Amino acid sequence: MAIGEKITISVIKADIGGWPGHSRVHPQLIEAAEEVLAKAKEEGTIIDFYVAYAGDDLQLIMTHKKGVDSPDIHGLAWKAFEEATEIAKEFGLYGAGQDLLKDAFSGNIRGMGPGIAEMEITLRKSEPIVTFHMDKTEPGAFNLPIFRMFADPFNTAGLVIDPNMHMGFRFEVWDIKEHKRVILNTPEEIYDLLALIGAKSRYVIKRVYPKEGHKISKDEPVAVISTEKLYEIAGEYVGKDDPVAIVRAQSGLPALGEVLEPFAFPHLVSGWMRGSHNGPIMPVPMHQANPTRFDGPPRVVALGWQISPEGKLVGPVDLFDDPAFDYARQKALEITEYIRRHGPFEPHRLPLEDMEYTTLPGVLKKLEERFEDIE
């Protein structure tokens, strides 16, 4: 392949067993997935791959020519997760296979448990991308940083001074409860956009597109986020959604530093212990993506890549492995210490409507007959 041709980048993740508890991925699970993907690369199914982890989530990063939602690619990811799950079961790892919510692959991995972010793009002369991997949180955790990357001039100077970005971007927002979507233009609809995405447990940014007149086609995404909600698939709490994202950078898009800048502020996200608490998202290098304190605080890893003209993944560069993010980490720990002192009280604990898949409904049912009217 060559510059100007179509290539697909797929990031597919699943929690298939923690070591120990919910803290990290066992190295042999990574090796098992690597073996499956290496064989697929030899056979020409994929161009290149890398297996990463964030907390207890196994992360598959692949390039290929098969487009988004390819049964071949999704089936390959499912096979990698199944092979790793067998080892997880052999070792007795915690929650072995917990994100594989169906017994057999049926052509598309969506709705089966794993989280997916994919984009088919026209390869530029230089194609820098960042893959983000979060643990112990939900898809809405990306709302604030993605907004800042592509719509906040206080974060992204290019929106003001780069003529190729000055027209702004289009945001595809999903209502994940009503299963509807809307596309909003920035900067002209910025307040409408914020009205929605501020409610991060319901309205999530799914994709960002250029506008008409940009050097990149307006139908080609420049950012994509996984939006799978595990509880909607399983019907019960089986773990937080732990989203992933792919963001393109440079040359009419946010520069690499503008893509990373939002994470200098450890904003509050939902998830953490038992998926039922608010806490700060802490930017960390991959080797520190091992949530321990109260199963947290929630983590985000940023891996930087260049896509070669042949579609190879040149990288990764562990972008948060940098003292420039030490202050954000320290601030996240201060917020952690403060908010943990609330114990089982809101706003540390999530509001009632987000506690549906915990013991709380059972407690209310048990006490139902003891409630009396107040005169």
UniProtKB/Swiss-Prot annotation:
Binding positions for beta-D-fructose 1,6-bisphosphate per the UniProt entry: 22, 94, 107-108, 136, 250-251, 274, 295, 357
Thermal properties of activity per the entry: Optimum temperature is 95 degrees Celsius.
GO molecular function: fructose 1,6-bisphosphate 1-phosphatase activity; fructose-bisphosphate aldolase activity; magnesium ion binding
Protein EC: 3.1.3.11, 4.1.2.13
Binding site for Mg(2+) 3: 240-242
Entry binding sites for Mg(2+) 1: 15, 22, 56, 98
Pfam families (alphabetical): FBPase_3 (PF01950)
Residues that coordinate or bind dihydroxyacetone phosphate: 22, 136, 274, 295
Keywords attached to this entry: Carbohydrate metabolism, Gluconeogenesis, Hydrolase, Lyase, Magnesium, Metal-binding, Schiff base
Essential cofactor(s): Mg(2+)
Family matches, as InterPro entries: FBPase_V, FBPase_V_sf
Regions annotated as coiled coil: none
Activity control, per UniProt: FBPase activity is inhibited by Ca(2+), ATP, ADP and phosphoenolpyruvate.
Catalytic activity as recorded in UniProt: beta-D-fructose 1,6-bisphosphate = D-glyceraldehyde 3-phosphate + dihydroxyacetone phosphate; beta-D-fructose 1,6-bisphosphate + H2O = beta-D-fructose 6-phosphate + phosphate
pH dependence: Optimum pH is 8.0.
Pathway(s) served: Carbohydrate biosynthesis; gluconeogenesis
Binding residues for Mg(2+) 2: 56-57, 135, 242
GO biological process per UniProt: gluconeogenesis
Active site (UniProt): 15 (proton acceptor), 237 (proton donor/acceptor), 240 (schiff-base intermediate with dhap)
Tagged with keyword Magnesium: yes
Membership in a protein family: Belongs to the FBP aldolase/phosphatase family.
Quaternary structure (record): Homooctamer; dimer of tetramers.
Domain comment, as recorded: Consists of a single catalytic domain, but remodels its active-site architecture via a large structural change to exhibit dual activities.
Purpose: Catalyzes two subsequent steps in gluconeogenesis: the aldol condensation of dihydroxyacetone phosphate (DHAP) and glyceraldehyde-3-phosphate (GA3P) to fructose-1,6-bisphosphate (FBP), and the dephosphorylation of FBP to fructose-6-phosphate (F6P). Can also dephosphorylate, with lower activity, other related substrates including fructose-1-phosphate, fructose-6-phosphate, glucose-1-phosphate, glucose-6-phosphate, glycerol-2-phosphate, phosphoenolpyruvate, 5'-AMP, 6'-ADP and 7'-ATP.
NCBIfam families in alphabetical order: FBP_aldo_phos
Protein name: Fructose-1,6-bisphosphate aldolase/phosphatase
Gene this chain is encoded by: fbp
